Amino acid sequence: MKIMIFICGEGLGHTSRCLALGKELLAAGHEIEFGAYGYSRDLVEKTGYRIHEIPSEIKLVGKAGGFDLSGSIEATLKNARILGGPKVLKLIKDFKPDVVVSDSYYLGTLAAMLLNIPVYLIINQSNMEDFFKNRGVPIRLLGDLTKKFYREVFEKTDKIIIPDYPLPYTVCRKNLNFSPGLWEKLYYSGPLVKEKYEEVEQIPLKKPHIVSLIGGFGYREPIFRKVLTTAALDSGINYTLISGPSLDPSKFKEIPKNVQILRFVGDTFPYIRSSDAVIAPGGHSTMMEALSFGTPILSFPDEGHSEQENNAAVIEEEGYGRMLSYSTPPEVILECIREVLEDKKYRDKVKRLQRLASELDGPKAVRELLEKEAGKKVS
């Protein structure tokens, strides 16, 4: 089959799971092309896949550890391209795919629908209107319009793929709210993770070891600094801090001896596998990667970002790790780290999810779904 994969470029998690799916599809002999923008486009290109530049849809901005909704809406409108729709339509017409897979990229979803091409939508959040709750009246009205728009899109897609564990283990469950009429369209694939636990080699890290994955947004710098302060409180716990592409490690002058800082790392899986816990924001894909590798999570969701806060709340409630905040002092962060390291229940719970991820094999499951459903229409 010929398959077009569209990727939302806000947050690298969309890209990582689409690369996982692309790897699986290519290995099975399918012809794949990607559409992406921003960092996502760069990552796909570096991987060596065929990639097309597509118009951006959403622009996320923040400040001092918080998600700035009004600023994000303004930035999105400023970056909107009037001719974006025709460009995406032409891209699809030129490639002539048998099926379109869209990871939260709605312009590509609508274009596929317009051309009567089967479309499979990958999302880990359906209640986007929650972003707009308790805001000013104009933004609340925008939330109502958003809800109606997404409901229409969901009804017209061939399938909605949730790249998460099936219930009751679904980490993004607080972000999902589908009407009963859509339930038969939902497909819980399991995590879409590019590497398999058993295929990733461990690296020699001094134990116990914490890896911090702070990436994407410069406004997460305060928590980066706070982790450095936390590390200085106990030299017996070792840290690797991966700063992300928008944060320059050279700006940090006093680095504790038990800390190494790395710039953007192309492959974080060896660090996730070899560490005893992962410090991360509340992004869904990073959580899926950590849990698929059986590593507990210390989550610092972006303040005001309801999707991340909901993900982190499930991590806390289910005992997969701890939910912290940007206001949590270093002394408390350290105690939470010690708790996760010392209390066996955290490791036992995430090891169960590691086994389940292996059994589900998300990329393979989605490939087989596409072959079974879209492949029938092609033949």
UniProtKB/Swiss-Prot annotation:
Pfam families for this protein: Glyco_tran_28_C, Glyco_trans_1_3
Cross-referenced Gene3D superfamilies: Glycogen Phosphorylase B (3.40.50.2000)
EC number: 2.4.-.-
Recorded superkingdom: Archaea
Entry GO MF terms: hexosyltransferase activity
Principal EC category: transferase
Keywords: Glycosyltransferase, Transferase
Family, as annotated: Belongs to the glycosyltransferase 28 family.
Designated name of the protein: Uncharacterized glycosyltransferase MM_1636
Organism this protein belongs to: Methanosarcina mazei (strain ATCC BAA-159 / DSM 3647 / Goe1 / Go1 / JCM 11833 / OCM 88)
